[in-house]
A protein has these predicted regions:
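Conserved residues in the N-terminal Rossmann fold of short-chain dehydrogenase/reductase
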Residues: 63
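Proteins that catalyze or organize thiol-disulfide redox chemistry
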Residues: 1-30, 35-60, 68-75, 79-83, ...
Length: 113
């Protein structure tokens, strides 16, 4: 059983925390740009949770609500949802727009990392 006080596998980030949580991270970070109203984003969420758990300690997985965080959304030119950006050493090294099945998402991530 999981302890409810544990941090979720996919942590939220904001315009304020993005630089520390993503750009200055010591390992690769997968950012899920999503919105509450986005159906495909909700469909993708369980796969991202599993990927975060499977890669704990190797890759951080975070999510950013585009409606609540317009600064970062604009900075990275996010237009379609869901959008996934993979960062290494503060730089975008891979991107994916749209919903992918979990197997394809895992393959994309493995190739990008």
């Amino acid at each position: 059983m999981s302890d409810k006080s544990e941090e979720p596998a996919v942590r939220p980030v904001t315009d304020v925390t993005f630089a520390d949580d993503v750009l200055a991270a010591g390992r690769p970070v997968l950012v899920d740009f999503h919105a509450e109203w986005c159906g495909p984003c909700h469909t993708l969420a369980p796969a991202l949770e599993q990927i975060a758990e499977e890669n704990a300690g190797r890759i951080d997985v975070v999510k950013l609500d585009v409606d609540k965080n317009p600064e970062i959304t604009t900075q990275f030119g996010i237009r379609g949802l869901p959008t996934l950006l993979l960062f290494k050493a503060g730089e975008v090294v891979a991107s994916q727009v749209g919903l992918l099945p979990k197997a394809r998402l895992k393959a994309w991530l493995a190739e990008a990392v």
